[in-house]
Amino acid sequence: FLRHVADAALDRLRIAGGGTGGHLYPAIAVARAWMRGGPERRVLFVGTARGIEARVLPREGLPLETISAAGIIGHSIARKGWAAALMVRGIAESIGVIGRFQPHVVLGVGGYASAPAVTAAWLRRRPIVLMEQNVVPGMTNRLLARFAFKVAIALPGAAAHLPPGKIVDTGLPLRGEFTGGPPREASFWEGPLRVLVFGGSQGAHALNEALAEALPLLGEDARRMRFV
């Protein structure tokens, strides 16, 4: 996916969504690859003032425009009505962003901010690509997939939940600081095997519990390992 993005004969990319690191950081990797295509390349993120993007993107030197959006899933009827009103407002704001920035393609990365931004792209007839980082796609990407030209997935299992014929299995885009680093020194491998366990969003608690329950199955091997 990054290779195709970097080689595309396009100049302006708008990235829609965010809210959590799982949505945002792969999008940053795509943005960096896009801009390596030449000095004329421009990228613009669209998110909310409450999401992680409002804190991270200024640090990364990447431009962000904020729109109105709020989550709907798991909230009261009153909250859903309020979120629906924000959705309409966010679509109008996103149409304004499209008019100013004139993107050649819109990339939706998931999260509730993606919904109004991608819907606006569909209304303005802009090519839409979605990026799904999870094995079970979120509600936003499942609903928006019908409008997309392609859906880039990080894990093959996601294809079962998305429209056939649009899937591109690209893997997860990684930022440059996590690839191509120097080889580990020999001392890195000394001592117990160190295992870092972490999950994101809804899977974090379940993953930690599953590991704790599985530790007795390791028997004596567990003494030679350190879990964090």
Which residues are covered by each model-predicted region?
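Donor-nucleotide binding loops and adjacent catalytic segments primarily
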Residues: 51, 56-60, 183, 187-228
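Short amphipathic alpha-helix
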Residues: 23-35
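Residues at the starts of beta-strands that form the adenosine-phosphate
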Residues: 12, 40-44, 63, 127, ...
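Active-site-proximal region of nucleotide-activated glycan assembly enzymes
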Residues: 41, 122-182
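Conserved nucleotide-sugar phosphate-binding/catalytic loop shared by glycosyltransferases and other
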Residues: 12-18, 40-86
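Glycine-rich phosphate-binding loop signature in dinucleotide/nucleotide-binding domains
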Residues: 38, 97-102, 189-190
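Glycosyltransferases and closely related glycan-assembly transferases
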Residues: 93-106, 114-129, 142-147
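An amphipathic, basic-hydrophobic alpha-helix
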Residues: 74-105
